[in-house]
C-alpha cells in the first residue's frame, strides 16, 4: 500500500499530477481543492495517498494532508459513491465545507456538485453525519506544513481548454463545462484559477 509520496512534480494536468519519487513517476489524481495548493513543476511536494485497485486500472488518489484522505475514505464507503465521485465532491468543496454542509443538512449545496442527485445527497447526509459523530471535531482542520507551496503560474493560451478538460474529468458534461468556463474566463487567468472560479460559481 502506498500511503505517502514525497518527490518532484514533473507535470501538472488538472486533476492529475505526475510526481517523481526514486526515479519512478507516479500519476496521482487529486481533488482540485488540493491541486490548487501544489507548488509548480520542478518543485518538491508531499502528498498523502490512497491506492485503489480496479479490474482495469490501479489508481492513486492524493491529498495534501491525512484529514482530507480520511474524508475521501469515508466518502467511498457510502453506497453509490466511488472514487471518481468522491474526487468530484472534494473538488467542488473543501473538506471543511463538505463537513459543514453535511452537519447542517444543506441539501441544496450538495446537489449542485457533479454527479450528486437528491437521493445521493440525502444518503450522504444520513450516512456521513452519523460517521462524523465518532470523529474528532477538528479532524478536517487543514494542516499547514504538509506541502510546499508557491504562487500560481500565469495563464497560458490553452488555459481554458485545460480547465474544461479538468471539469469533464470531474464529472461535468462537456457542454456544461465549456459554459462554466466561458462565464468566468479572462485572458490572464491560469487553468487552475479558471477551474477554481468555475467551481465556485457553480455553487
Curated annotation (Swiss-Prot):
Domain of life according to the entry:
Bacteria
Query: Subunit structure, briefly?
Result: Homotetramer. Forms an RuvA(8)-RuvB(12)-Holliday junction (HJ) complex. HJ DNA is sandwiched between 2 RuvA tetramers; dsDNA enters through RuvA and exits via RuvB. An RuvB hexamer assembles on each DNA strand where it exits the tetramer. Each RuvB hexamer is contacted by two RuvA subunits (via domain III) on 2 adjacent RuvB subunits; this complex drives branch migration. In the full resolvosome a probable DNA-RuvA(4)-RuvB(12)-RuvC(2) complex forms which resolves the HJ.
Region ranges (Domain III): 155-203
* Name of the protein described by the UniProt record: Holliday junction branch migration complex subunit RuvA
Q: Map out region (Domain I) in residue numbers.
A: 1-64
Which one of the record's GO molecular function terms can you name?
Answer: four-way junction helicase activity
Mention any one GO cellular component term assigned to this protein in its UniProt record.
Holliday junction helicase complex
- Alphabetical list of HAMAP family matching this protein: DNA_HJ_migration_RuvA
Family statement drawn from the similarity comment of this UniProt entry? Belongs to the RuvA family.
Q: Which InterPro entries match?
A: DNA_helicase_Holl-junc_RuvA_I (IPR013849), Hlx-hairpin-Hlx_DNA-bd_motif (IPR003583), NA-bd_OB-fold (IPR012340), RuvA (IPR000085), RuvA_2-like (IPR010994), RuvA_C (IPR011114), RuvA_C_sf (IPR036267)
Record GO biological process? DNA recombination; DNA repair
Alphabetic keyword roster: Cytoplasm, DNA damage, DNA recombination, DNA repair, DNA-binding
Q: What does this protein do?
A: The RuvA-RuvB-RuvC complex processes Holliday junction (HJ) DNA during genetic recombination and DNA repair, while the RuvA-RuvB complex plays an important role in the rescue of blocked DNA replication forks via replication fork reversal (RFR). RuvA specifically binds to HJ cruciform DNA, conferring on it an open structure. The RuvB hexamer acts as an ATP-dependent pump, pulling dsDNA into and through the RuvAB complex. HJ branch migration allows RuvC to scan DNA until it finds its consensus sequence, where it cleaves and resolves the cruciform DNA.
**Coiled-coil intervals:** none
Q: What is its main location?
A: cytoplasm
Q: Where is this region: Flexible linker?
A: 143-154
Which chain regions cross the lipid bilayer?
none
**In this record, what's one Pfam family?**
HHH_5
- Chain positions covered by the region annotation Domain II: 65-142
Domain-level remarks: Has three domains with a flexible linker between the domains II and III and assumes an 'L' shape. Domain III is highly mobile and contacts RuvB.
Cell location: Cytoplasm
SMART domains to which the protein is assigned, alphabetical: HhH1
Amino acid at each position: 500500500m502506498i500511503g505517502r509520496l514525497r518527490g518532484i512534480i514533473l507535470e501538472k494536468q488538472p486533476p492529475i499530477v505526475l510526481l517523481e519519487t526514486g526515479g519512478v513517476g507516479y500519476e496521482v489524481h487529486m481533488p482540485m481543492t488540493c491541486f490548487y495548493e501544489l507548488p509548480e513543476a520542478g518543485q518538491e511536494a508531499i502528498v498523502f495517498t490512497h491506492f485503489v485497485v480496479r479490474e482495469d486500472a490501479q489508481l492513486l488518489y492524493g491529498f495534501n494532508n491525512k484529514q482530507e484522505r480520511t474524508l475521501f475514505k469515508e466518502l467511498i464507503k457510502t453506497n453509490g459513491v466511488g472514487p471518481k465521485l468522491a474526487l468530484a465532491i472534494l473538488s467542488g468543496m473543501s473538506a471543511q465545507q463538505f463537513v459543514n454542509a453535511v452537519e447542517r443538512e444543506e441539501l441544496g449545496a450538495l446537489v449542485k456538485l457533479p454527479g450528486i442527485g437528491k437521493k445521493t445527497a440525502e444518503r450522504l447526509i444520513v450516512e456521513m453525519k452519523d460517521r462524523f459523530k465518532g470523529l474528532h471535531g477538528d479532524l478536517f482542520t487543514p494542516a499547514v506544513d504538509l506541502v510546499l507551496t508557491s504562487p500560481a503560474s500565469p495563464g497560458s493560451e490553452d488555459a481554458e481548454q485545460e480547465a474544461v478538460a479538468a471539469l469533464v474529468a470531474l464529472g461535468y458534461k462537456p457542454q456544461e463545462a465549456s459554459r462554466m468556463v466561458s462565464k468566468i474566463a479572462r485572458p490572464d487567468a491560469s487553468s487552475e484559477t479558471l477551474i477554481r472560479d468555475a467551481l465556485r460559481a457553480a455553487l
